[in-house]
Amino acid sequence: MIIEGRNIKESKVLLKTKYCVIGSGAGGAVVAERLARDGHEVILIEEGGYFSPGSLRGDTEAIAMAKLYRDAVMQSTDDQSITLFQGQAIGGSTFVNHALCFHMPHELINEWISSGIIKDFTSDDLEKHYSEVERFLQPKVTPDKYMNSSTKLFHKTFQDRNLSTTFTKRNTNGCIGCGSCFRSCDIAAKSSTDLTFIPEAINNGAKVYSDFKAEKIIFKGKTATAVEGTIMSQMKQAKGTFRVDAEYIVVAAGALHSPWLLGRSGIKNKNLGKHLKIHPIVPMQALFKKDMDSFNGVPQAISSFQYTDYKNKKEKGFVYYCDFSGMMGTSTHMPGMGNELRERIGKLRKMGQTQIMLLENTTGEINCKKEKPVITYNLNEMDKNEFVKASKIMGNLYFESGAEAVYLGNQVFTSPDQLNGISTDLFEPFASHKYAAHFQSTCRMGASSKDSVTDNSGKVFDTENVYVADASILPDSVGVNPMLTIMAFASLVAERLSKK
């Protein structure tokens, strides 16, 4: 059973455990399950609420997303030019993501090992942990009958031109292609952590609390003694306080909030909140003569890594994901206002969309001294030029596949020749829609505190018992959707921590 803070009547809750895990997403849930399985006393706390399968079925996209995403889908960079999607519920971002499962490229993990960033484990060790978490997820390729028409067109267009595509494995079981992954799965067909790792942790004795917002780790010298925070109401207002006394604390609040929590708890490390990678995305849309009905089917089932180069340390390229994430979300990416926009929305059935995801050179940072994380991220010229290249290629592919028009940011292109006018100006702040959901490397692991925040076991330098187990410990961008890699690294941290 999950204990919901919104239903707790006491104004102050005091708890005690051996291990306190903060966060229930791809990192925290995996750690809690492993520790509980090994017979340890575990309390897992999550700031977001608990939503049972199907409980959001009657909500509109806007209402459901406001409940499930941090800041009601309004979290962004400090200049508000890049929207930052992050799940805030039991299950974390696994509750609202598209369930894509990738192993990180061998070139990258080998680069980390050869450079000395990782010394205590090998790529074979990591593969063991991928296998461990895949036992729960059972990732598989989406059956053809559940792929939407945009996916099929994307595949044919790329294959006809000898461009590579990948049918992506997804952690689903019983998926029927309803297309609502981004707002949870109404039929519980997505193997998010709330349906996999967390129930197993509870079965093995772990206690799980929703609506518990961790705000400070209490230290005595270098030893953490407790986590303190606020109990949130259903409307995300403060309704009480809590304290969890613990022998070990595992921070898994995500790469935006883990460094913030450590910073406001007194951790002083020059790398804290630095080295932020986000995999920035620009959506490109295409208007066709025929009805596409792209909203019928799995939102993301195919991708292309044709233009990636994982051996290049500066320009690793970009990935195309065929994507159609709901009518509301897709409509917000269209150019125009007023009647012009209304007319375009009226043609939504004829639309296709591709995400252009950059394996960026840019690095951002988080200010951990404010009341909430302040994220600074400004695309450098190299990355803007990569977006230009990627947009021209995809735009031409759309026209070759029969598109009448292509939309990019506030621009409408009606012929291939017009694509030549795409320049870096279109990727300045607010000139095009940009968003991200893959936040990484802000508490990165490494050999020493000179360039890292945690060691290779996930322990925070200069502490005795504080660990991090989420995307923030990844030394750099993993170059693919990071969920499975986050889980593998969390499994590794949990294995070592369980021996304490």
Give residue ranges: language-model regions.
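FAD cofactor-binding and catalytic pocket of flavoenzymes
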Residues: 97, 269-396, 436-441, 461, ...
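Rossmann-like flavin
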Residues: 90, 94-175
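Glycine-rich loop(s) and the adjacent beta-strand/alpha-helix scaffold that form part
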Residues: 34-37, 41, 48-53, 58, ...
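Extreme N-terminal leader/targeting segments of oxidoreductases
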Residues: 1-19, 37-38, 499
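N-terminal FAD cofactor-binding segment of flavoenzymes
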Residues: 40, 47-96, 104-106, 151-155
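Helical element adjacent to the flavin cofactor pocket in flavoenzyme catalytic cores
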Residues: 180-247
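A glycine-rich dinucleotide-binding beta-alpha-beta segment and adjacent secondary-structure elements
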Residues: 16, 167-168, 174-181, 216-220, ...
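N-terminal Rossmann-like FAD-binding beta1-loop-alpha1 element of flavoenzymes
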Residues: 18-44
